[in-house]
Every structure is written in C-alpha cells, then in structure tokens.
Design a protein with these regions (language model features):
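Sec-dependent N-terminal signal peptides of Gram-positive bacterial secreted proteins and lipoproteins
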Residues: 2-24
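Extracellular adhesion/carbohydrate-binding repeat motifs centered on closely spaced tryptophans
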Residues: 14, 24, 332-435
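N-terminal carbohydrate-binding accessory modules
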Residues: 22-71
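Acidic/histidine-rich helix-loop elements
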Residues: 40-58, 76, 80, 115-118, ...
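Aromatic-lined substrate-binding rim segments of carbohydrate-active enzymes
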Residues: 57-111, 120-125, 129, 133, ...
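Surface-exposed, active-site-proximal loop segments in enzymatic domains
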Residues: 78-87, 108-122, 151-153, 221-227, ...
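Active-site region of glycoside hydrolase catalytic domains
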Residues: 124, 128-225, 231, 239-263, ...
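Aromatic-rich peripheral "rim/lid" segments of glycoside hydrolase catalytic domains that contact
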Residues: 268-335
C-alpha cells in the first residue's frame, strides 16, 4: 500500500512541475479561442523563397517574440521533401518555444491556374503528407489550406467548395481537431465569403481567412483607395470588415485577416512612413474594434533577416499596428534627447545619431528635420506636399488660420488639402478656403 501511495505521489509531483502550456498545447483549441490567441502577426517566407530559407535562424523567432508578434503565417509553395520538413520543423519549434503561433499556408499555384482533378489530387496529397507529419504537434499549429484563390479557380465557386471538401476530408484522417482555414475566392475577398460551403468534416474546428490591401493600398485604384484618409476611404475598410462580421454572425465561424500591407512596397513605394502610420493605425484600430486578428504582409518590409535586426525607420509603423517591442525599444522611441544650440533644436538619439531630411515620431508627435538635422517650424514643402509645423515643431492637423488670415486644412497625415471640399468648405489649388 505504501508503495502505491509513493508511486502516486511521485506521479503527482512529476505532472505538477511540468509547464502548464505543454498541457494546453496538446488540448484541442476551439476556433473562437484560437482567434483570440492569434492576436497580431506577420506573413513570412521562411519556407517559401530561396532567400527566406537560407536566411532563417532561431534568432529570428526570438526577435519576433520580443517585438510582440503573436503568430506567423508560414507560406509554402513547393513540394515537401525531407529537407523541407527539417527546416519547417525547426521553424515551428522555434515559434512554439518563443510563444508564437505557427500557421502553415500552402500556395497551390497549379491548382489555382488549372483546377483539374489531376491538380486537385496533387494538393490533396500535399496536405495529406503534411498533416500526417504534424499530426502529433501542438494544437497551436494550424493549416491555412490555400493562399489567395486567384487565376482560373477564382471564377469557379462551386469547384472551390469541392476542393475544400476533399482537402478537409484528407486532413481530418490524421488531424480530427486541428484548426483549418478556408478562404473565399478572388484574392480572399470578404465579399465572397457567402459563396463558401462549410466542409462536411469541419468537426467544429474551422476558421475563414480573408484579406484586403494584401499587396498594398493605392492612391489611384478606387477599390483600395487611400490617400489622406478621407471618410470615403475609411468606409471602404469598414465595409469590408462588416462583411466578415456579418458572415461570422451567420455561420458562427470566426475569421482572420491573413494579409494586409501598410504601403505599396512592391509597386513604387509611394507612401511615406508617416502616411503608412496613418493608414496602419486606422486599419488595425478597426480590426481591433471588431476583434478580428490579423497578419501583416510581410516580414521583410520590417525585418533585416540577414542581420537579425528590425529596420528602425519602420518600427513606428509596427507600433501603429499595435506591435510593441519588449525590453529594448527603438532609439526613435527611447533614450532620445532634445538639444538646442545657437542655430536651433535637434534630436540626439541613443547611438548619438540624429535625424536629417526625415520625419521622426517623438512622444506621439511628428517632427520634420532639415538637411542639417534641425527641427523645422512653419510651412514646409516636402515630397511635393505642403505641411505646417507648429512653433514647437509638432506637425499640425485639422484647420489652420494662417498669418495671412486665410483658412487651410491639414489632413490626418499632415499634408495640406487642395482642390477639395472638407466639411462643406471648398478649398482651392493653393489650399485656402474659397469664401
């Protein structure tokens, strides 16, 4: 009897000292709980591109965790070989070790170009092999079945539903309670969520992935227009989110934004950091209000993977999205010192550098520094737009009555509004209110 009690006591002690998260990770996670855990993350090419595969190292996951990245969407386009699994295993382990949720997302290009039975079998086989390999992994790992339904497949909603039915059936053979994600056609557009048919074997562990502005906002394309953040431009974003909320209410299935981008990095890079911040803050705030998690596209725009460091100039954009770097903040945000000499004010950073010919965010306000590094005041013409800096150097927004007695309007990004109507007041080509 004493031996039995001793054995039970040892067993109790053994389990009591194990980390709680090791148990939690091996318990199936319901979709709504999973959505809350996802929080805010990044799309990554760690297992997709040659450069991404070669550059990846464990420090990356540590840095992501320190920045407050809660999940990563690991995009994959190739067949899974032993080497592919070896690298992906490492990435997933690194994520879990650093409290980052990993999501495997498959490109399935051939199937999107030609949704034939032959190509469907290839994708079903790919997911079957991948699901078998990860069947005993933490339930924090999830599967995003197809990245962006584009090309020919986007024209065939019924075929897409058949495809999801077959893939889900295959994955459920080995992963009955793992979170799976399906996305609507036409580049995961939430307008087509209602076209989705819920797969038979969803088993109550299903989410929908959708996105907008995945490749960028635009200053000319009306479908994803963002210039200065007009009411009309904001409404485009709100309407998309409401489509997702309506679908969630109708189906009881949570959604997640798998990709959105703060700037047009791949198409001219026409948005300044300051403009990106204004856009990023509005999008992230609206998604936060809706309790919809999101992933930002993509890591290489913010993180130097060759040198394992965040780009200092992009940290304000990350912060606008709600990411917070732990322990050591950017020199932009901490350990800065205002210095005044016989010419004017300038900003000394922790590394003794100082901003020149650029905007800098300090204590929640934007400042412009000239080519000598001195803080600007008054009207300044920057990148083909007029801005007004208050006497303390902070950027002005809203209505401004200038010394000439005329009224001007400064947009949310600080730029002067021209040739437009604001609140019923017409503004001319020089920005002044036309009386």
């Amino acid at each position: 009897m004493k031996k039995k009690i001793s054995a039970l006591l040892l067993l109790f002690l053994f389990f009591s000292i194990l980390p709680m998260k090791s148990f939690a990770a091996n318990v199936p996670i319901k979709p709504w709980d999973y959505a809350q855990k996802l929080g805010k993350g990044l799309d990554v090419d760690w297992s997709k591109t040659k450069e991404g595969k070669e550059a990846y190292n464990s420090q990356t996951a540590k840095d992501f965790s320190d920045m407050g990245i809660k999940h990563v969407r690991i995009r994959i386009k190739d067949d899974m070989t032993d080497e592919s699994f070896k690298l992906l295993d490492k990435q997933i382990k690194d994520c879990l070790d650093n409290n980052i949720i990993p999501i495997i997302a498959y490109q399935a290009d051939e199937l999107k170009n030609d949704p034939s039975d032959k190509n469907l079998k290839k994708v079903v086989k790919w997911w079957g092999k991948t699901a078998e390999h990860y069947k005993d992994y933490s339930y924090l790992l999830s599967f995003d079945l197809i990245i962006e339904v584009t090309d020919e497949l986007k024209k065939e909603p019924e075929r897409l539903n058949e495809i999801y039915e077959e893939i889900v059936t295959e994955v459920r053979k080995t992963n009955s309670k793992r979170i799976l994600m399906i996305s609507p056609r036409v580049r995961s557009n939430p307008e087509y969520l209602n076209d989705l048919k819920i797969p038979t074997n969803h088993n109550g562990y299903l989410m929908a992935e959708w996105h907008f502005y995945a490749s960028s906002p635009s200053k000319t394309n009306n479908e994803k227009l963002w210039t200065t953040g007009t009411d009309k431009e904001k409404q485009i974003i709100i309407d998309k989110i409401n489509l997702a909320l309506d679908w969630q209410k109708k189906t009881g299935i949570p959604t997640w934004v798998g990709a959105w981008m703060a700037g047009d990095y791949n198409d001219g890079n026409n948005y300044s950091v300051q403009e990106q911040i204004v856009f990023a803050k509005f999008v992230s705030d609206e998604l936060d209000k809706a309790n919809i998690p999101f992933a930002v596209n993509s890591d290489t725009k913010f993180y130097d993977r060759q040198n394992n460091r965040w780009y200092d100039e992009m940290i304000p954009v990350l912060k606008a999205m709600g990411f917070t770097k732990n322990n050591v903040d950017s020199v932009i945000d901490k350990k800065t010192e205002w210095v005044k000499d016989n010419i004017g004010w300038w900003l000394k950073r922790a590394d003794n550098s100082y901003p020149k010919l650029q905007w800098e965010l300090v204590d929640g306000n934007w400042y412009w520094f000239d080519n000598n590094g001195y803080m600007a005041t008054g009207w300044k013409y920057i990148n083909n737009k007029w801005y007004y800096l208050n006497n303390d150097g902070s950027m002005k927004t809203g209505w401004l009555k200038d010394t000439d007695g005329k009224w001007y309007y400064l947009n949310t990004d600080g730029s002067m509004a021209v040739n437009t109507n604001v609140g019923g007041y017409n503004l001319g080509s020089n920005g002044a209110w036309i009386v």
